[in-house]
Amino acid sequence: QAGALSTTFTASQGLLLMIPNMFKIAGELTSTVMHVAARSLATQGLSIFGDHQDVMAARQTGWAMLASASVQECHDNALIAQNATLHSRVPFMHFFDGFRTSHELNTCLMLSDDDLRSMIPDELVREHRRRALSPEHPFIRGTAQNPDVYFQGRESANPFYLATPGLVQQAMDDFAKLTGRQYHLVDYVGAPDADRVAVIMGS
C-alpha cells in the first residue's frame, strides 16, 4: 500500500499464517516475492523436513508459484521472480525444498549488483511506487462490494494472470542473455518418443 518494493521469507506454519493477507495482496495486484523453504506442517506430530504441504495449502491464494530444484536455481529464480512480479503485477511465491535445498552446501555462481540492476527495470519500480496510496492522487481501495461489482473486479484481474506465464519465460530468456544460464517454465528430460511422463517438482 505504501509503494515499497518488498520481499520476505517463510516456511511451514509461518506460511499458513500469511494466507489471509496473501488473498489481499493478490487481489490488489501488488508486486512482491515470498521465498519459501517448503516444509511439512505440524499435524499429529511436528516435522521440520522437506514437503510441499505448506505451498500447496497456499495454492488457491492467487500467487504465481515458481519452484527451484538446486541452490543455483534458488539464487537465479529469486531474481527472475522479482523481474516477473514487476512486469506482471502478480505476486510470486518462489519455493524450494526445505533442508534438502535450503540448507545445502554447494558451489553457486553469484549474481553481481550490476546483474541485479539490469533485471530490475527502474521504470517498473517507479510505476509500482506510483500505485501507492497518496493524498496527491487519491483513489478508493478495500471497499465492501455487492456480488455484481465483486465479480467484475475478480474478472478484471484475468488479463494479468493470462499474461504471467509468457512474462516469466521472457524473464528467464533475459536472464539467459545476461548469465548464459537458460531456464524454462517446464523442462523435459528423457526419450523423445516417450508415451508417458512423470511430472516432478523440486529437488
Please name every model-derived segment:
Residues 92-188:
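Conformationally flexible catalytic loops at phosphate/diphosphate-handling active centers
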Residues 7-9, 137, 197:
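Short, flexible coil/turn micro-motifs enriched in small/turn-prone residues
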Residues 13-20, 49-53, 60, 69-79, ...:
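Conserved active-site and cofactor/substrate-binding residues in soluble primary-metabolism enzymes
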Residues 55-59, 106-109:
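Metal-ion/cofactor- or nucleotide/acyl-coenzyme-handling active-site neighborhoods
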Residues 9, 35, 95-97, 199-202:
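Generic beta-strand/beta-sheet core signal
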